[in-house]
């Protein structure tokens, strides 16, 4: 008798992706983040759907509707904080997932990597638009500052900004369209995830050694389904500790003040996961230059396959590259810290140095160090 799992047109797709998928036998816990990102996306879509049932995208009632969700809707506070902190967990997993890709040379899967970078951009856009929806002070001023960056584009900039706003300032039209986009983009993300997986399964997974592992593959189920469940439990535990004990830990107190176009908050800053890019943006005195640096700080990820000059794929056996990688991580943490600080004397200089270092490590130091390691192989 034929196995339905292997013959049914629909079930066999799931089978080839999650059950009988040949997987390297030595992949570590760093490979758990793909499935955790899938879980985060499901959590965000579900909690977001229930929030959308009670939210109103009108400037007069948006803030009140959030209050209504937290006070009057059954477990509304839980859904709201799971959604807000779920975004933070999403970005933690994203950064670790990208970091894993950089460390182990997964970027040599060109299509998978580039779709991953597109996914990162779309997730960042979605998170930004979601932050505008509660219509607090930081929502309003964050939307004003970030959308205003597009006015730096020569010739069409101002027209483009007013077109996005739907008027001459961030107002009702802006909020309504941001809600529409924020609702639809996660489904586009889900579609892109399918393409991401499609390309990944063409080549198979990378592994910590960076070597071809065709001779030593094991089925995904039960080995990695069990392993993923551990990650799932840890993620849910971390999320629920955050939600139930300190739900506002990562938020901004300014967002509990309703949006007021007449008073600017003392320090306009985005959510923590955008601070590194925000620091790079602020460190350049020129508006257009800052915007280009901001975009390039993420877009630079697409250059990694081209900048890979090492004879080895993974950094597992490359101690000098490992040092450079951890310098880069430390630099990103420094940028994140600077992004949350006011624009004052020591922070401006630190931000500028950290921004220069970020691009120098990626474009110059990593390739040079890789070439040195290639030479050392011959000794």
UniProtKB/Swiss-Prot annotation:
UniProt family annotation: Belongs to the cytochrome b family.
Cofactor(s), by name: heme b
Residues binding heme b b562: 83, 182
Database matches in PROSITE patterns: CYTB_CTER (PS51003), CYTB_NTER (PS51002)
Primary location group: mitochondrion
Binding-site list for a ubiquinone: 201
Top-level taxon of the source organism: Eukaryota
Additional comment: Heme 1 (or BL or b562) is low-potential and absorbs at about 562 nm, and heme 2 (or BH or b566) is high-potential and absorbs at about 566 nm.
UniProt GO cellular component terms: mitochondrial inner membrane; respiratory chain complex III
Membrane topology: Multi-pass membrane protein
Cofactor comment: Binds 2 heme b groups non-covalently.
GO molecular-function term, one example from the UniProt record: metal ion binding
Subunit structure: The cytochrome bc1 complex contains 11 subunits: 3 respiratory subunits (MT-CYB, CYC1 and UQCRFS1), 2 core proteins (UQCRC1 and UQCRC2) and 6 low-molecular weight proteins (UQCRH/QCR6, UQCRB/QCR7, UQCRQ/QCR8, UQCR10/QCR9, UQCR11/QCR10 and a cleavage product of UQCRFS1). This cytochrome bc1 complex then forms a dimer.
Organism: Cynomys parvidens
One of the GO biological process terms: mitochondrial electron transport, ubiquinol to cytochrome c
Binding-site residues, heme b b566: 97, 196
Protein name: Cytochrome b
């Amino acid at each position: 008798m034929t196995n339905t799992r292997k013959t049914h047109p629909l079930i066999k797709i799931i089978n080839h992706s999650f059950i009988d998928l040949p997987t390297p036998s030595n992949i570590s816990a760093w490979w758990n983040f793909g499935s955790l990102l899938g879980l985060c996306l499901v959590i965000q879509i579900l909690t977001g759907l229930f929030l959308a049932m009670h939210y109103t995208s009108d400037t007069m009632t948006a803030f009140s509707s959030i209050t209504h969700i937290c006070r009057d809707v059954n477990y509304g506070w839980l859904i709201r904080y799971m959604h807000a902190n779920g975004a933070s967990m999403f970005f933690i997993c994203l950064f670790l997932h990208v970091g894993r890709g950089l460390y182990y040379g997964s970027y040599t899967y060109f299509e998978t990597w580039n779709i991953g970078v597109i996914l990162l951009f779309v997730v960042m856009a979605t998170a930004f638009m979601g932050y505008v929806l509660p219509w607090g002070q930081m929502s309003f001023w964050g939307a004003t500052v970030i959308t205003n960056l597009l006015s730096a584009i020569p010739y069409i900039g101002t027209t483009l900004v007013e077109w996005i706003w739907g008027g001459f300032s961030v107002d009702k039209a802006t909020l309504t369209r941001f809600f529409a986009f924020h609702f639809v983009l996660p489904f586009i993300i889900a579609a892109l995830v399918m393409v991401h997986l499609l390309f990944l399964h063409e080549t198979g997974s990378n592994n910590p050694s960076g070597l071809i592992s065709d001779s030593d593959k094991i089925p995904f189920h039960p080995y990695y389904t069990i392993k993923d469940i551990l990650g799932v439990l840890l993620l849910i535990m971390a999320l629920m500790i955050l939600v139930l004990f300190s739900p506002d830990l990562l938020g901004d107190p300014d967002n509990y003040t309703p949006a007021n176009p007449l008073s600017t908050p003392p320090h306009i800053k985005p959510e923590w996961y955008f601070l590194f890019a925000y620091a790079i943006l602020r460190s350049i005195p020129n508006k257009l230059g800052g915007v280009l640096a901001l975009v390039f700080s993420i877009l630079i990820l697409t250059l990694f396959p081209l900048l890979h000059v090492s004879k080895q794929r993974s950094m597992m056996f490359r101690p000098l590259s490992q040092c450079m990688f951890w310098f880069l991580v430390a630099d990103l943490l420094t940028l994140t810290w600077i992004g949350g600080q006011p624009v004052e004397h020591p922070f401006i200089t630190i931000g500028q140095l950290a921004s220069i270092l970020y691009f120098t490590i990626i474009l110059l130091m990593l390739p040079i160090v890789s070439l040195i390691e290639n030479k050392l192989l011959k000794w």
